[in-house]
Amino acid sequence: MSASPKSHLSETDICDRFITPALVQAGWTREQHILREYTLRPGRVVVRGQASHRDKASMLRADYVLFHKPNVPLAVVEAKDAKHSVGAGMPQAIQYAELLGVPFSFASNGDGFVFRDATLSDGVLERDLTLDQFPTPAELWAKYCAWKGWTPAVEHIAATDYAPSKTPRYYQLGAINRTVEAIAAGQNRVLLVMATGTGKTYTAFQIIWRLWKSGAKKRILFLADRNILIDQTMVNDFRPFKGAMAKLSPHAKGVERVDAQGQVTIEDLDLAVNKTTKVVDKSYEIYLSLYQAVTGTQEERNIYKQFSPDFFDLIVVDECHRGSAAEDSAWRDILTYFASATQIGLTATPKETEDVSNIDYFGE
């Protein structure tokens, strides 16, 4: 038996000569849809003395991730060289698709594709495809929307662009997309649990941005329990909101900001409360506040009572495990007053006691 004419080709050659052209022929573009060598996990950090390095064996990297649009993933494609069967990469493709929360997995050795469709839209889980039978972006997106059960209104919100900024990690993508999708579908209480150091504030920013830009949520309140969290959030992750955003306070100091080049500047924050009259300027769309600043003294309580109970469409509570779900909590006063707003709780450690339950309040 003669060797396959592709047998001398490397996996990279197979991708370049057969898989990528098949994707492009089906309408997938490098600019919008295709990401090669997509890192899901960079690998564990191994420390030896003063030196450290990434353990490449624990790295997870998909050969291709296909997107409906930037940051809205649809499918994973795993490649193997021609010495392997067409479907040899499917176990990896399924693993990566599950991490990304997408239902479509493909495997290829350059001779064709094996397509695994977890939506079971036509009752078939896996099928073989020739190179020229790869689904178009529109076909996969239609299957995806039908699988999700989205109406056109929900689809509009779920497909709203991310704010231009750093590339989110795969777990941030999952948290952002699933939260936006849940709220678009009508869920009004969401508990978002992310480990310390995984970028909760950046994740919250992208959720708020997409809900705001889609028009689903027009007036938003972000609550935290420390001034530094509010101030640094305003000059860093929430910086793209500048002009539409203000601190719900009559006073603030200049905030130090270090940019990507290491340059230090002092920035003044826009304030929503008049220092003399304590009257709130309601012309802003994004408000950030310490919970103490709106539920402390009677004068401070009057600040949030200046808003009608239906003023805010969305409230995001940072570090909600600090007691926001307790019946006698200061934050709970705010959440109860603005009960008609969609409410998101952010935490690294959900609080579950006989008296306080973040899960009971926000849901799982």
Residue ranges of model-derived segments:
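Signature of the SF2 helicase/ATPase Hel1-core->accessory helical subdomain module
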Residues: 292-303, 307-364
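Short beta-alpha junctions and helix-cap segments that line functional grooves
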Residues: 89-93, 207, 236, 274-275, ...
